């Protein structure tokens, strides 16, 4: 069965993690000095490496031959965790196991010492989805954990995690990745997979990933499959259903020229309903805003506004100024 690229190229060591050096360096230092907290909370938006780092940390604390905090990936413990056969390292999806009964079972099992590895590790993903009663049940075991127990919590919505849980965890804030960091990783994966890809296409995919490495790799996977291994800028537009920056520029030019007919022609011919204007860059153009108004209404008195028929093009800054002044 085909393995998705984001799974195939998931980081296996802290050194493989892209763009989260402050987090990985701290974890490696704690592992080397033996000062790792019994409970860690990873927080960030999707696709930034929270779950990957949690699994790497689970391997690192149980690795028989660690290297400066990184797991070796070759010992029986590392291999069992990678294969998902280690019964002492459990990944729990709080979205589907958010009740108090699930947490009580976890709490009761946590007191037993691990059978095959040094530390029993619970990775609770999307922990903010737990119910209030479940959080209360979890609080006691996090407050007074056995020496063999490690909790790694991950969330995309930190504000929903109770303060009583937050105060008992070490927090690690993962950052959104820069486009150049994502592009570098995409180029590496493309080289490994013998995918020919244009630099412009890589840069576009990196921007569309919106700070998430997993999204970027998934987009590359989708485009490479559709383009039979040769990814161009145009093939990315076609594969992802994007309007394209050139088409968007043509629309902007027509609006600036007050050519309503041309603008509408481009809009309806180049941007069918299935096309995503948001991802093509339209939403990132704050200079112009199209608004419908009655033909008989007075013109908008804003600097540099353009009025043609029933379409008015106004600078976004001017629009905000009118709203704030009550105009």
Q: Could you tell me what each predicted segment is?
A:
Residues 23, 80-87, 105, 118, ...:
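Extended, largely alpha-helical regulatory/partner-binding modules appended to the mid-to-C-terminal parts
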Residues 1-171:
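P-loop/Walker A NTP-binding region and its immediately flanking N-terminal helices
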Residues 287, 305-308:
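Low-complexity, glycine/proline/serine-enriched flexible coil segments
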């Amino acid at each position: 069965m085909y393995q998705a690229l984001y799974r195939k190229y998931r980081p296996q060591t802290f050194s493989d993690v892209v763009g989260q050096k402050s987090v990985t360096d701290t974890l490696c230092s704690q592992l080397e000095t033996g000062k790792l907290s019994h409970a860690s909370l990873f927080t960030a938006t999707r696709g930034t490496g929270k779950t990957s780092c949690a699994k790497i940390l689970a391997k690192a604390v149980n690795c028989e031959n660690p290297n400066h905090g990184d797991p070796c990936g070759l010992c029986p413990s590392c291999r069992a965790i990678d294969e998902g056969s280690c019964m002492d390292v459990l990944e729990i999806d709080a979205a589907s196991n958010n009740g108090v009964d699930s947490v009580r079972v976890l709490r009761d099992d946590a007191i037993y010492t691990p059978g095959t590895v040094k530390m029993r590790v619970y990775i609770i993903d999307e922990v903010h989805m737990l119910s209030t009663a479940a959080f209360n049940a979890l609080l006691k075991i996090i407050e007074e954990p056995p020496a063999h127990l490690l909790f790694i919590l991950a969330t995309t919505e930190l504000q929903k995690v109770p303060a009583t849980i937050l105060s008992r965890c070490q927090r690690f804030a993962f950052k959104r990745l820069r486009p150049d960091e994502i592009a570098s990783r995409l180029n590496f994966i493309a080289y490994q997979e013998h995918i020919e890809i244009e630099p412009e296409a890589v840069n576009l995919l990196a921007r569309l990933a919106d700070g998430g490495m997993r999204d970027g790799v998934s987009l590359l996977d989708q485009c490479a499959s559709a383009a039979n291994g040769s990814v161009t800028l145009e093939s990315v537009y076609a594969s992802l259903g994007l309007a394209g920056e050139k088409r968007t520029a043509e629309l902007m030019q027509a609006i600036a020229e007050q050519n309503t007919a041309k603008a509408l022609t481009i809009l309806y011919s180049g941007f069918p309903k299935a096309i995503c204007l948001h991802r093509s860059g339209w939403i990132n153009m704050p200079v112009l805003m199209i608004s419908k108004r009655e033909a008989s209404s007075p013109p908008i008195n804003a600097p540099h506004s353009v009025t043609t028929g029933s379409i008015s093009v106004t600078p976004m800054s001017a629009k905000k100024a009118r709203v704030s002044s009550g105009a």
